Amino acid sequence: MKINTLILILYSFVFFLYSQKLLAKYEITDPPECFNNKGETVKFQNMKSKTGKITIGIAKKDALGKPIIYRFNYDKSSKFLQKFIDYHECAHHQAGDLEKINLPLNSKDYLLREDMADCIATIRMKSNHLNAKNSILNTLKELKKAMKYIGFDELGIKRREDNILKCFNKNVSLKNFMEDIVKQKNIEK
């Protein structure tokens, strides 16, 4: 009887801790400076979803055709993941991805676009944070958990993690990396 009671108490305590983690609220960070490929300032708008359990960013054009990033449920993640998502979505504007046709989800070109945005975000995070390695590792930990939560398979999660780590280990400045991307995109035209 005492053992059953002890197990029940421990189980309840673990469940309580886990539920508190899901309910955790974080301070929403200020968005970074962001300009699109045309030099226009990208605006950020915080949004809340009552049912949303994870942080999501979406790069779009608003009703007037101006560049914007919608920041959903940023209070659900740490500053590391918030910054990474902001940088990733900003990268889509910087690279001119919104000027192109929408690509089929999970097509080769779509995945290359996402890899590039992750790479730009990683290099930007690396150049803007004193303890960059810790920032990236914390980001990856949260990002992998969120990806698993929304249904990504292990292979997709591992692929993204490997790309982010590969980009982190690049010895290149953000400015030079962006210049290379612009040159590459001009060649592809």
Regions found by a protein language model. Give the residues of each.
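Classical Sec-dependent N-terminal signal peptides that target proteins to the secretory pathway
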Residues: 1-24
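Auxiliary, metal-adjacent structural segments of Zn-dependent hydrolase domains
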Residues: 20-64
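Sequence contexts marking disulfide-bonded cysteines in secreted/extracellular proteins
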Residues: 33-35, 118, 166-168
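Active-site scaffold of zinc-dependent metalloenzymes
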Residues: 45-79, 90-99
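Soluble non-cytosolic domains of exported or imported proteins
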Residues: 76-81, 85, 107-115
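Sec-exported extracytoplasmic/periplasmic mature domains
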Residues: 91-99, 118-130
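Post-HEXXH active-site segment of zinc metalloproteases
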Residues: 96-118
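Long, well-structured alpha-helical subdomains associated
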Residues: 127-189
